[in-house]
Each structure stands twice: as structure tokens, then as C-alpha cells.
Amino acid sequence: PISFGFKIGGRLQADYDQFDGIYTRNGNTANEAYFRRAILEVSGVAYTDWKYAFNVDFGESGSSKWDEASITYTGFKPVNVKIGRFDPDFGLEKATSSKWISTIERSSIYDLADWVNDKQDGMGIQVSGVAGNLFYGSAGFNRAKGNEDVNGKNNNTYNLRGVIAPMAEAGNVLHFG
């Protein structure tokens, strides 16, 4: 096992749109261009059992924000404990990588239940693990920043995910969950 290591990376995704007169207020054609994502990433391992990931997004909003800032302890094999700011383990796209999504739009459940699948600038903890090459499970707790009820009490989100993958080999995966 690697005791210490790090990698630096990033991604840049740009969007360009051309509108005909139907979609503009004045009836004229228009266009826009912007960076959907402009992310700088630093991740790695320390003391063999500790992983870290820090990502800053300089994208669409014009200001920078931490997309992820998390530390994971991997010493309880096969269970991992992650704490910090990260996307909850909600769907396949976020569980694998947002760099390599199969389509530009995520499934509708992300919009239908957005309160349970987004960190919303908050913090959380997640416990996840695998059993053989067949089962994966995770449980998470997140508290979104500025998400209080009318009495000022923080609203929390809880996620539970289970996956069964009867076929999981390079290039071929069949999974449920």
C-alpha cells in the first residue's frame, strides 16, 4: 500500500447556447457562453489509511466555492468513514464520477428529491462498505448550510443506499440499487 501520495487535476466544461426569438424577451436571437464547471482538484492518501479530496469550483457563478473538502478513513476494512463536505452517495452518476457521465442530464429523481441528494454547501458524515464484489452499501447524514425550519432548527438529510452487482468486471457492469 502507498503511505503517501497526491494528485492534482481539474476539469473545464463550457456551455454555449443559441436562442431563436421564441425564447427571448425582445423576440430577437441571442446567445450565451459560460463555464459550467471550472474545477481544480487535489486528492491523495496519507499514512496509508487516510484519503483526502479538495475541489474548488470557479465555474458558472463567477465566484469560487468549495465543491468538496473531505477526509476518509479506510482502516476499518472493508468499511470507510468519510467526513466533510461532499456529495451524498445518492445515484450512480455521483457515485462513480461527474467527470464521465453517460448523458448531460441526470435522471429525474435528482430534481424530484433534490433535498436529499445535494450537500447544499453543508457538512456531513458517511459510512460505506463492500462485501466481496457483489454488495455495496452506504449510510450518510448531511446538514445543509442555511437550511433551517421556521423555528431556526437545522434540517438534516439522511441517505441510505444499497447496491447488488451480480456482474462487475472491467467494461461490463450489471447492478441494481
Predicted regions and their residues:
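Outer membrane beta-barrel
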Residues: 2-177
